[in-house]
From Swiss-Prot:
Gene Ontology biological process: transmembrane transport
Main subcellular location: membrane
Organism for this UniProt entry: Rhizobium meliloti (strain 1021) (Ensifer meliloti)
Protein localization: Cell membrane
Record key words, sorted: Cell membrane, Membrane, Transmembrane, Transmembrane helix, Transport
Chain segments annotated as transmembrane: 19-39, 50-70, 91-111, 140-160, 164-184, 201-221, 244-264, 288-308, 342-362, 363-383, 403-423
GO terms under cellular component: plasma membrane
Family: Belongs to the amino acid-polyamine-organocation (APC) superfamily.
Protein name in the entry: Uncharacterized transporter R00093
Top-rank taxon, per record: Bacteria
Length: 465
């Protein structure tokens, strides 16, 4: 599959279809992330207690608000599949672009695997409630990934319309649980006595450690920009969909912490597999239990569905630019999807979903995402310096520059330390992986890249050049 032949003129390639609107962008971003309200975030409570979990929720919310603001400005201008990869290619350079593309692929593929694991765990939990213990989770994990890959193969409009419906239901399930508990539908009253009796069981270091899993509330919202080449109006749809998405997630995250922390002891909450579903069980309401079971299932499926979409677009874009073998850069002649990239990434997701523990998969996804956010800080500064305001048309201009960039860099640095406290070995192993991949690209792959084709945006020369 190596591109060893000389570059010859090629006929016009099939392109992805521009069929999406702001609602689909919202569904892509929130759909990927909302599963973080249904599982994973609660490990932050286990790391530092209830107060630490709440602080992690809001600090991570600030981090991702900065991400959404920065991403909306650059993506509304660089309207190409691949998102941050395309940004790095135009603004920074090839090596950074390769790494950012790899960050995206690994972050979304690992998140997809984590979602599939959660589907299996949820079904096992429900089977246990019915007295059927020892359910084999693996067939359900495989079925979930294969079905969603098939859906992505068949077309982006159907895929993200499906995401829009099930994401809306999953979000409304959280709202329904919150309202029901507030109006006395729970057999167990809300109890926040641990806030005063044991506010920080592990001290201030627990707050820092909890930030690791606090990111799970919002991880993946930046995936909205992967649809840049498939929305009808990128300059309008991407900022609207992304900013509406982060506001939705901030509301959902706060409601989730409030309900779960009030209904369950923090010691149990900190290790629960499906905290919102468990909170519904505590209420004693069969209707709420069924609703939150459906919400959990839909949230995990929506997230895995969006992850397949985003990972395949990043892999497809890198292949189209010959950063990877160009064979993967093909578009299906009927469905107009990057079908080879979709199919290729399926077995990778299955390997991790079937063979790795959930916390390790989640950590790999978080760390890959953090590396991408760190890139955004340098990317934003270079973008504003090379093309100042007024030099090129922007669909959205984020306010208070460079404050969001500085805040994002500080919070990313803190998050790295938080991950190091609990997963230092995994952090070191992941850094080694990306260093080896960078060396491979520099010495083996870069010679196939068409240097003259890298800059595709109709922009003037950078300021000072």
């Amino acid at each position: 599959m190596d591109d060893t032949t000389s570059a010859a003129p090629e006929p016009d390639r099939l392109r992805l279809l521009r069929v999406l609107g702001p609602a689909h962008v919202w569904a892509l971003g929130v759909g990927i992330v909302l599963v973080g309200e249904y599982m994973g975030w609660n490990f932050s409570v286990g790391k530092g207690g209830m107060i630490a979990g709440l602080m992690a929720c809001w600090v991570a919310g600030l981090l991702y608000t900065c991400v959404a603001m920065i991403d909306s400005e650059v993506t509304s201008t660089v309207a190409a599949a691949g998102g941050q990869y395309a940004q790095a290619k135009h603004i920074v350079g090839p090596l950074m672009a390769f790494n950012v593309g790899l960050f995206l692929v690994m972050a979304y593929t690992m998140l997809e695997a984590a979602n599939a694991i959660t589907v299996g765990f949820l079904l096992d939990t429900v089977a246990g409630m019915q007295g059927q213990t020892g359910l084999n989770q693996q067939p359900f994990i495989v079925l979930a990934i294969m079905f969603l890959a098939w859906l992505n193969y068949r077309g982006v409009l159907a895929t993200l319309t499906f995401n829009l419906v099930i994401t809306a239901i999953a979000f409304l399930a959280i709202v329904a649980l919150f309202v029901s508990v507030q109006f006395g539908a729970s057999a167990v009253p809300l109890d926040f006595s641990a806030i005063t009796s044991d506010p920080l069981p592990y001290g201030w270091v627990g707050i820092v450690a909890s930030l690791h899993f606090g990111l799970w509330y919002y991880l993946g919202i930046e995936g909205t920009c992967q649809a840049a080449e498939e929305v009808r109006s990128p300059a309008r749809s991407l900022p609207y969909g992304t900013m509406a998405g982060i506001m939705t997630l901030l509301i959902a995250a706060t409601m989730t912490w409030y309900i779960c922390s009030g209904l369950m002891p923090w010691e149990y909450l900190g290790q629960a597999g499906t905290p919102l579903f468990d909170a519904a069980r505590v209420t004693g309401s069969t209707g709420l239990m069924v609703l939150l079971f459906v919400g959990t299932a839909f949230a995990t499926l929506a997230s895995a569905n969006g992850c397949i979409n985003d990972a395949s677009r990043a892999w497809f874009s890198m292949s189209r630019d010959r950063y990877l073998p160009s064979w993967f850069g093909a578009v299906h002649p009927v469905y107009r999807t990057p079908y080879r990239a979709i199919v290729f990434l399926v077995p990778i997701a299955l390997i991790f979903a079937l063979g790795a523990p959930l916390d390790q998969v989640v950590t790999f996804s978080i760390l890959s995402g953090l590396l991408g956010y760190t890139f955004m800080t340098f990317n934003m500064v270079m973008f504003r310096n090379k093309w100042p305001l007024g030099r090129i048309k922007r669909g959205y201009v984020h306010p208070f520059h460079p404050l969001p960039t500085v805040v994002l860099l500080i919070l990313c640095s803190t998050a790295y330390f938080a991950v190091f406290l609990g997963y230092g070995t995994q952090l070191s192993a992941m850094m080694c992986f990306y260093i080896v991949a960078s060396l491979w690209f520099h010495f083996r792959r870069y010679k196939f890249v068409r240097r003259g084709d890298q800059f595709t945006m109709p922009w003037p020369k950078p300021h000072g050049y």
